[in-house]
């Protein structure tokens, strides 16, 4: 079984290292205020869209927006030089 959370985080970390010019992820990871603010704003925006999809009972959109929330949250973790393992350990502690 694959581990999509770790795999996605690995891609984000790769973009952080290589900073490809036309990468959306790299633009969010830019070492400037614009990049940091953009990633934080996207977490809020996508969380709002997730909540609205839940309110509307739209399960397809809920899955889509949930994935967007998780992706942007992982970008913020990478910005903060955290590893996805810290998040997974916290989740594991809550079981």
Curated annotation (Swiss-Prot):
Q: Which GO terms describe its biological process?
A: L-histidine biosynthetic process
Location(s) in or outside the cell: Cytoplasm
Q: GO CC terms for this protein? A: cytoplasm
Sorted keywords for this record are: Amino-acid biosynthesis, ATP-binding, Cytoplasm, Histidine biosynthesis, Hydrolase, Nucleotide-binding
InterPro entries named among the record's database cross-references:
HisE (IPR008179), PRib-ATP_PPHydrolase-like (IPR021130)
EC number, UniProt record:
3.6.1.31
Q: What catalytic activity is recorded?
A: 1-(5-phospho-beta-D-ribosyl)-ATP + H2O = 1-(5-phospho-beta-D-ribosyl)-5'-AMP + diphosphate + H(+)
Q: Report the GO molecular function annotations.
A: ATP binding; phosphoribosyl-ATP diphosphatase activity
Pathway annotation from the record: Amino-acid biosynthesis; L-histidine biosynthesis; L-histidine from 5-phospho-alpha-D-ribose 1-diphosphate: step 2/9
Q: What class of enzyme is it?
A: hydrolase
**UniProt family annotation:** Belongs to the PRA-PH family.
Indicate what this protein is called per its UniProt record: Phosphoribosyl-ATP pyrophosphatase
**Organism (species):** Halobacterium salinarum (strain ATCC 700922 / JCM 11081 / NRC-1) (Halobacterium halobium)
Query: Could you read off the lineage of the organism from its UniProt record?
Result: Archaea, Methanobacteriati, Methanobacteriota, Stenosarchaea group, Halobacteria
